[in-house]
Amino acid sequence: MLLPWSWGYDKPDNIDDLYRLVGSVLTTFLLIIQIYLRVAEAGNNALYAVHQKTYKVGCIPCMLYVASGGSLDWTLGDLGIPYSYGMELRDTGAYGFLLPPEQIIPTGEELWAFHLTVAREIIKEFVP
């Protein structure tokens, strides 16, 4: 499970709405990170429940490497989508970015469980 930003170690600062509600940059920053991680962990637990495949949760440079120009940077930075997540597929490196056919459907099932859970968690967090 990958969280923005991929271009560096900075944490996302989509704090405008939350800043008005909470009242301080530090509290807001911590709240954003807590919400991101809580939602990501809930999605990750849903992934695991499908086929008991373990995924890690963390920022891209912390888990992989610094990489600019990724879709997470674009969706959060340019489009302002506050819950921007990415996935590294379930293969552990033997096939690169090409999953073997027998891993495609299980990966799709895991990703469906993740996205459904993340959507529910976001609704629970923000819809009265």
How would you name each of these model-derived features?
Residues 1-128:
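C-terminal accessory segments enriched in acidic
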